[in-house]
Amino acid sequence: MVSMTTSSSSYGTFSTVVNSSRPNSSATFLVPSLKFSTGISNFANLSNGFSLKSPINPGFLFKSRPFTVQARAAAEKTVHDFTVKDIDGKDVALNKFKGKVMLIVNVASRCGLTSSNYSELSHLYEKYKTQGFEILAFPCNQFGFQEPGSNSEIKQFACTRFKAEFPIFDKVDVNGPSTAPIYEFLKSNAGGFLGGLIKWNFEKFLIDKKGKVVERYPPTTSPFQIEKDIQKLLAA
């Protein structure tokens, strides 16, 4: 026999389902009732099961699964805990960006979105870099093979054609078995309606001054559309 009870909390309404039809089964699980809204502070996320963005801290995903020691450790991890390689192959500890707002983007040189995104990213970086804003660009060749060049070719393209001054890093995979650890972290902390996979070039993650993922934007969201969200975090 399956029974269901409903309870409410500040995080939403949950139904507790109990299956007592089998003698040796006492499994229960929570089914959250989600209210969907948009905006940087009110975004309901669904990733690897049901999850909610906490009203107390919009950058934290409150999941229905048991909060284990491992889950707690993962929740406490930030972008600042990672070390990546730059476009020249040198290690860069991301804790150097503590106290700064970051926009992390997977870029490509031969995409239909390349020109508009690089131009707008360069404009935003020039406008806000002295206020504590950083853009971290990660080249990726997984979408239509649109970033086939070497690191030196990618660097020359971005810096010569678009005058990009923001940091560009080593080419990475953002999906699949060879996914870069930084992208595993980004996706697990901001699954959202986009799901676990990066969908295309120029998907964007906005990071607050503490290294927490605040928002995720699809490739079709232009950098200029994110400007107000950047301003809010810089002012915080």
Curated annotation (Swiss-Prot):
Q: Which reaction does it catalyse?
A: a hydroperoxy polyunsaturated fatty acid + 2 glutathione = a hydroxy polyunsaturated fatty acid + glutathione disulfide + H2O
Q: In which tissues is it expressed?
A: Expressed in leaves, stems, flowers, green siliques and seeds.
The protein's induction, as recorded, is: By salt stress, osmotic stress, metals and heat treatment. Up-regulated by abscisic acid (ABA) and auxin.
Single GO MF annotation? phospholipid-hydroperoxide glutathione peroxidase activity
Give GO cellular component annotations, separated by semicolons.
Answer: chloroplast; chloroplast envelope; chloroplast stroma; chloroplast thylakoid membrane; vacuole
Per UniProt, subcellular location reads as: Plastid, Chloroplast
Single GO BP term: response to oxidative stress
Q: Where is this region: Disordered?
A: 1-24
Q: Which UniProt keywords apply?
A: Chloroplast, Oxidoreductase, Peroxidase, Plastid, Stress response, Transit peptide
For the protein in the UniProt heading, the enzyme class is: oxidoreductase
Q: Under which EC number(s) is this enzyme classified?
A: 1.11.1.12
Keyword Transit peptide (UniProt): yes
Q: What is its main location?
A: plastid
Q: Which Gene3D superfamilies match?
A: Glutaredoxin
Question: Which regions are flagged for Low complexity bias?
Answer: 1-16
Residues the record marks as active site? C111
> What stretch of residues directs this protein to its organelle as a transit peptide?
1-64
Task: Give the protein's function.
Answer: Protects cells and enzymes from oxidative damage, by catalyzing the reduction of hydrogen peroxide, lipid peroxides and organic hydroperoxide, by glutathione.
In the record, the note on similarity to other proteins reads: Belongs to the glutathione peroxidase family.
Name of the protein: Phospholipid hydroperoxide glutathione peroxidase 1, chloroplastic
UniProt organism field: Arabidopsis thaliana
- Designated gene of the protein: GPX1
